[in-house]
């Protein structure tokens, strides 16, 4: 269960409407709903990163060969992601990794790589009510999602999701997606209060006693070190 609430004053709502034409109630309700979605996103992504473990490390300072400019070195990330995707295929016998979740830093590397086949999504497709956005496709088959809350140095999450609902490393099962009380009056302060609640289950099949215990086979990771952009 996840709950979130907020309150405001009638004076603030009246002044905002009069001076700026802003509906404070609508803005707060939208912000609360967005915050719950963000928290669920971050919980799931964090759990998958933990499930993936350390993965492999790509040290940009130890790359061999003669590079022309920094974009040549950045191209190594796409190769390492392909290796991680193929490791998933070998472990699961289902398919290669078909999505990645990257930090803004890793996204910049993919965008600036000289030989990477990263195709950006068209403008307008970025809009979504989450903090994790679909930003393009790598090598024609791997969907790229950017986690805007990820700090520099956050490892790249590589995962596989099959065509069926059960062909996945983890399961998010909402049974009360989002419930709102609507604005209610606090009799002690004469302030409107609004609350949101969601209830869901989240499960990773890691226990071999009750399942195949192969959830970790569906995910991998690439850790970046000594990243340079010049």
Feature-to-residue mapping (PLM):
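Generic detector of intrinsically disordered, low-complexity, polar/charged segments
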Residues: 50-52, 58, 62, 68, ...
């Amino acid at each position: 269960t996840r709950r979130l609430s907020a309150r405001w004053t009638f004076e603030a709502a009246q002044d905002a409407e009069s001076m700026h034409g802003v509906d404070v109630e609508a803005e707060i309700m939208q912000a609360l709903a967005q915050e719950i979605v963000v928290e669920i996103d971050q919980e799931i992504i964090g759990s998958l990163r933990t499930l993936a473990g350390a993965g492999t490390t790509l040290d940009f300072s130890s790359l061999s060969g003669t590079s022309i400019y920094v974009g040549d070195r950045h191209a190594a990330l796409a190769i390492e992601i392909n290796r991680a995707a193929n490791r998933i295929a070998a472990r699961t016998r289902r398919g290669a990794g078909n999505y990645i979740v990257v930090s803004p830093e890793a996204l910049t590397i993919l965008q600036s790589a000289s030989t990477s086949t990263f195709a950006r999504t068209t403008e307008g497709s970025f809009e979504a009510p989450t903090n994790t956005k679909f930003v393009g496709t790598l090598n024609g088959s791997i969907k790229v999602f950017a986690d805007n809350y990820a700090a520099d140095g956050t490892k790249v999450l590589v995962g596989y999701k099959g065509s069926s609902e059960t062909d996945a490393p983890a399961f998010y099962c909402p049974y009360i997606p989002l419930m709102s009380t609507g604005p209610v009056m606090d009799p002690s302060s004469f302030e409107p209060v609004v609350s949101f609640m969601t209830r869901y289950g989240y499960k990773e099949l890691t226990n071999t006693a009750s399942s195949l215990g192969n959830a970790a086979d569906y995910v991998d990771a690439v850790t970046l070190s000594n990243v340079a952009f010049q």
